[in-house]
Amino acid sequence: MTKGNYSYPLDPSWSTEEITTVLHFLSQVEKAYESKVDRDQLLEAYKAFKTVVPGKASEKQLDKAFQEASGFSTYQAVRAAKAKEKGFVTLGK
């Protein structure tokens, strides 16, 4: 899927640092779909993301909003990364 114009699902109550953390994670997810992303980098970005969005319900809401806007699933990207021991994650068609 090609990169389109869409808005990121961000919470206005987040600090600049928290927004940067979430955007970095979403960027890693985009890379997994558009080309490839290093598994370890994606999981590190996810770990940092979970410090901003620790709850499962909030994570699912953000994933749903991001998937509706972009077509990319954070859940599927993290699942694919966890399934690999090393290397790159590629989810694009």
From Swiss-Prot:
Identification of the protein by name: UPF0223 protein stu0998
Domain of life: Bacteria
Family membership: Belongs to the UPF0223 family.
InterPro entries on file: BH2638-like_sf, UPF0223
